[in-house]
Amino acid sequence: MKHTSRFRCAWVGATALVLVLASNGALPPGYQGKPFRDSVYGAGAQVIPGRIECAYYDLGGEGVAYHDTDATNHGSGELNLKPQHQRPHSNSYVWGFRSEEGVDISYTKDFADFNHTNFVAPATNQLYIGWTDNGEWCNYTVNVKKAGTYKIVALYGNAANRITFSINHQPVSECQLPLATGSMHIWNKAQIGTITFSEAGLQLLTFHYNKGNNFAYFDFEPVAANK
């Protein structure tokens, strides 16, 4: 099946980017990744509208489901092996999450994320992608339940970077994180743009990020016209 898509984008205000994509509602031909699932999370493809957890990127490994600049998981596979980072409010599933894969994942901890004031406080044990570097990306198979326009709301820490989304391998330009929080572990939650899916169905969402942030999740919320 031939896959075609087209998009347009425009700036709205100072910080938000409108992303408009027309798609045939199918995954790209030949894509070998699979929606994340394990013994705890068995739901499969994450759903839009809803929350896309950054740590639940697809299964498939380096070059298929993600690209990382090195093979070490500097959170679950390195930092969290130290006893002081295995917090009593957590468990081995959380501190060791996807430890054998290259994407750097950790979780929110009492002494790192809750010993100060956040702009928006994350949940305890919230998984996140950290140790980010330029050129890294993760793929997410998403199930778009209803065509239309959605706000993108990010929970993130640190730099006011630009991040890029692609859908079905088609670049959709950049979104601007609106506020530099001052630390990887000072968190903010804010709308960074909107995205329009012209059709429902499975889509491949690729999140491209740059050096200097922690990313927990993206909420995709229907705008009023969709509801």
Language-model features, listed with the residues they occupy:
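Extracytoplasmic
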Residues: 25-227
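Bacterial N-terminal signal peptides that target proteins for export
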Residues: 2-12
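Bacterial N-terminal signal peptides
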Residues: 12-22
